[in-house]
Swiss-Prot record:
Sequence similarity: Belongs to the frog skin active peptide (FSAP) family. Bradykinin-related peptide subfamily.
Signal peptide feature range: 1-22
Any one GO molecular function term: toxin activity
Designated name of the protein: [Val1,Thr6]-bradykinyl-Val,Asp
Keyword RNA-binding annotated: no
Propeptide: 23-48
GO cellular component term of the entry, any: extracellular region
Tissue specificity of this protein: Expressed by the skin glands. Expression levels in inguinal glands and granular glands are virtually the same.
GO BP: any one term: defense response
Organism of origin: Physalaemus nattereri
Keywords, alphabetical: Amphibian defense peptide, Bradykinin receptor impairing toxin, Cleavage on pair of basic residues, G-protein coupled receptor impairing toxin, Secreted, Signal, Toxin
Residue span of region Disordered: 27-61
Protein localization: Secreted
Length: 61
């Protein structure tokens, strides 16, 4: 009986450890995606700041 208890605790412990590693990897991936999105957004903002508002290069009067 003691052997089964130890085995069960070992399995549960290893399951919890592997679950925490998976959650950590998911969190890192999410943070990386967030950083990439912010970088893309800042690049778009830089492009839009270069052109004055209301400027259209192909304006026909």
């Amino acid at each position: 009986m003691a052997f089964l208890k130890k085995s069960l605790f070992l399995v549960l412990f290893l399951g919890v450890v592997s679950l925490s590693f998976c959650e950590e990897e998911e969190r890192e991936e999410h943070e990386e995606e967030k950083r990439e999105a912010e970088a893309a957004e800042s690049a778009e903002n830089l492009i839009s700041k270069r052109v004055p508002p209301g400027f259209t290069p192909f304006r026909v009067d």
